[in-house]
Amino acid sequence: MRFFALFIYRPVATILIAAAITLCGILGFRLLPVAPLPQVDFPVIMVSASLPGASPETMASSVATPLERSLGRIAGVNEMTSSSSLGSTRIILEFNFDRDINGAARDVQAAINAAQSLLPGGMPSRPTYRKANPSDAPIMILTLTSESWSQGKLYDFASTQLAQTIAQIDGVGDVDVGGSSLPAVRVGLNPQALFNQGVSLDEVREAIDSANVRRPQGAIEDSVHRWQIQTNDELKTAAEYQPLIIHYNNGAAVRLGDVASVTDSVQDVRNAGMTNAKPAILLMIRKLPEANIIQTVDGIRAKLPELRAMIPAAIDLQIAQDRSPTIRASLQEVEETLAISVALVILVVFLFLRSGRATLIPAVAVPVSLIGTFAAMYLCGFSLNNLSLMALTIATGFVVDDAIVVLENIARHLEAGMKPLQAALQGTREVGFTVISMSLSLVAVFLPLLLMGGLPGRLLREFAVTLSVAIGISLVVSLTLTPMMCGWMLKSSKPRTQPRKRGVGRLLVALQQGYGTSLKWVLNHTRLVGVVFLGTVALNIWLYIAIPKTFFPEQDTGVLMGGIQADQSISFQAMRGKLQDFMKIIRDDPAVNNVTGFTGGSRVNSGMMFITLKPRGERKETAQQIIDRLRVKLAKEPGARLFLMAVQDIRVGGRQANASYQYTLLSDSLAALREWEPKIRKALSALPQLADVNSDQQDNGAEMNLIYDRDTMSRLGIDVQAANSLLNNAFGQRQISTIYQPMNQYKVVMEVDPRYSQDISALEKMFVINRDGKAIPLSYFAQWRPANAPLSVNHQGLSAASTIAFNLPTGTSLSQATEAINRTMTQLGVPSTVRGSFSGTAQVFQQTMNSQLILIVAAIATVYIVLGILYESYVHPLTILSTLPSAGVGALLALELFNAPFSLIALIGIMLLIGIVKKNAIMMVDFALEAQRSGGLTPEQAIFQACLLRFRPIMMTTLAALFGALPLVLSGGDGSELRQPLGITIVGGLVMSQLLTLYTTPVVYLFFDRLRLRFSRKNSKPVVEI
């Protein structure tokens, strides 16, 4: 009593405290960063190594395996995967959430150093690492085009100057430059000319390497001067290499230009990049795992004027893709939804209280509670994101509930003629415990979320804390500011209302009278209500089992990502044509704004595409509908497939798969994996629950298998090393020398001129110089025949792995897909030597599925404990919790009605309903207990009176929560995929709960009261001594 009086009788102090909370909140709001979702990125580091010309199997055994053994000893590694292709290996290390990325990077470098001695010689550079996840979609893509500059020159400028500058911006983790490669001097050998001159390929390589050296020459000095010695020991251009003497034939000099074409070109000619049908260099920018995407993009945009100033006029720099506009639009939509929710909630209060002054009180209390929450969010290191703003939107209904309960009870005393200050004190004292019970039990719902681990726990923690803080501030405001404003602003009123207010008043009275009549009937038919209650419990169980489930709602971010997978024997020239064909099909779609893509490198039969869609307001279809439409057109392209998926704000794992979800096969036997993977992939492709099924196991690439006759080689004076060196020199794009320039280092690349290696007959022109200096054709000691070989070799941990990726057809949930996969694996009878498990997002979904029920039960148990402590009773918390089954039925039926799967967002809605619907029971039980204690009423009379007295605040609080959540259901635009499941769950649960709990709660209250009396009578019987 004294606590409440302290604030009621000191209005200036109370107002200043509220103002201080508001000012701190405004300051926190201005300082909060902006993000699509809470920070949930796993720390990921990518290790890269190259050995030009090495086969995928060689890369896997000689490069990947030593590195994996060393990297696997690092503490905190959650998952390690690797992919080895022609000449390159990439190892992805995913660390635990609590691992610092910089500390992990130091451990990775130490592991690379430890494995260095085990790696093969001939690697052009040491393995390197990057602190970025290659499977993440770029946060921004910049393109460089030019009418006069070559692709190699553009690439050099982009990688040497632009990429270096962008990489220094805070938050940037990796700048991947694609579309070409660095400039190089390319030496295209003529095998016949070499044979005629008696010059071996090794001799050419050694001559070039010896002619281009960079060594210190020292200095000469006398007593006065000092001269630095400088020589022309370096060759920098193709024109300087052409006259190089590489051999003497009968005293005549054989120059490099006599036996080869020497051109200024690029290191790897098998690279291509395009933007909207124009050749382009792509700068794909990815953020650090812990970086804020909006702040990083803003930093890049702020740097763009400086970048454009340093670019020559012949180069055009454009932003091809930017993730930030859709994120900002989504957050703006949430903020508008929040404002609408506040307005609707205040409208509900006005309709019930029919007083402008009374409505002004919650109109002040709600903003103070919500704005004050921003200060706590800033101190906790949170961000303004979809989930935290959704928490505040839902909190609108909660925070007004506390104010409504206090305000309505004070208003009731005022209507009875009590003086304002006395009514404020008396009304607050009567409901103070009720408000505390409602708030503490609501916060208790979120305690299990705070203890939840993994990605779901990290994702929901910010939501739970934000909502809990808002409820806590609301509790303080409702017991201090609200009664103070009631005591000083409201006046005692007469029983009659003004004529213009009679309509709403009569409706409320009529509803209350109708409720009283129906409640009497219900209390006389308790068994029927009991059957209905048990039916809702059973229906909950059935609906939860039957409803489709998924991890996170599929978002429409306005960006699509596509992976091209062509025939494994396709050439680079044909692959570049496929890229152009796919880009044309996509560019012609009316919903597409921009298309960029690239192909080449170590994976000749693959490519990547990034598609920016028009803003939501300029297109009618969702991203998934556009994908469905394009899938039909793209399927008509022969010899290649393009797999499209919508870019999501959450992507788990480091696998760069061609679909959203992955199922990984592991085996210690590569042969067993290669035998069973095609069978499993074929079976999964036939499932209607899956779409775009594809695999990263590609073991049907065309290979020419050379078989050496070692006896003949020994007799001819040729060793295996010389033969392998011949093949590497001829067909491996071998980097044989380095050209040093002020801004970068470039390579001299040697291979047989493509004009002489168009088919297998090129092998017949190859020869080796034996120990006697004679030219021995390759065909003398080797036979060759075509065979199949893998284009890539993949590992997970130290086991051979193959990942089958898939998307979901429209109308199919992730739970239906995973169940179908598990059922298929059982039906196929896959041996124990091949193990299957879900990866990435599908794996997290499986883990979340296992913990969902535990989480709901833990929340209910926590609420029960809190209520039991507050009421000092084992029974009354059960009465209050009896409201939950009806809310669960309503929520699940609403999700089914809207064809929305049960996702992590819907789980949040269920958790919120646990807190919301019990408020009705708390208000009933509190007044019934008080009536029994102080009024001497029977349980039947007490609960009946409590239901009637609390009918108006129950209707007000429920409608406030309902109208607070309704804008989430009706919202459209960017980000609505996240908001709608939450709104649907809450609105459905509230409607069903309001219809049932007004009747089931009093029945359950009486049931437990009779049960209590029965047990108390048994315990009170005298003990009979025998």
Curated annotation (Swiss-Prot):
Cytoplasmic side: 1-6, 354-359, 412-430, 491-852, 918-947, 1008-1026
Membrane topology of this protein: Multi-pass membrane protein
Location in the cell: Cell inner membrane
Signal peptide residues on this chain, from the entry's feature table: none
Transmembrane segments: 7-29, 336-353, 360-379, 389-411, 431-453, 468-490, 853-875, 895-917, 948-970, 985-1007
Any matching Pfam family: ACR_tran
Domain of life where this protein originates: Bacteria
Keyword Transferase set for record: no
InterPro entries, per database record: AcrB_DN_DC_subdom, Acrflvin-R, Multidrug-R_MdtC
GO molecular function, one term: xenobiotic transmembrane transporter activity
One of the record's GO cellular component terms: plasma membrane
This protein's UniProt keywords: Cell inner membrane, Cell membrane, Membrane, Transmembrane, Transmembrane helix, Transport
Presence of the UniProt keyword Lipid metabolism in the record: no
Periplasmic side: 30-335, 380-388, 454-467, 876-894, 971-984
Family: Belongs to the resistance-nodulation-cell division (RND) (TC 2.A.6) family. MdtC subfamily.
Quaternary structure annotation from Swiss-Prot or TrEMBL: Part of a tripartite efflux system composed of MdtA, MdtB and MdtC. MdtC forms a heteromultimer with MdtB.
PANTHER family named in the record: MULTIDRUG RESISTANCE PROTEIN MDTC, PTHR32063
HAMAP family on file: MdtC (MF_01424)
Protein's UniProt name: Multidrug resistance protein MdtC
Organism: Salmonella typhimurium (strain LT2 / SGSC1412 / ATCC 700720)
Gene field: mdtC
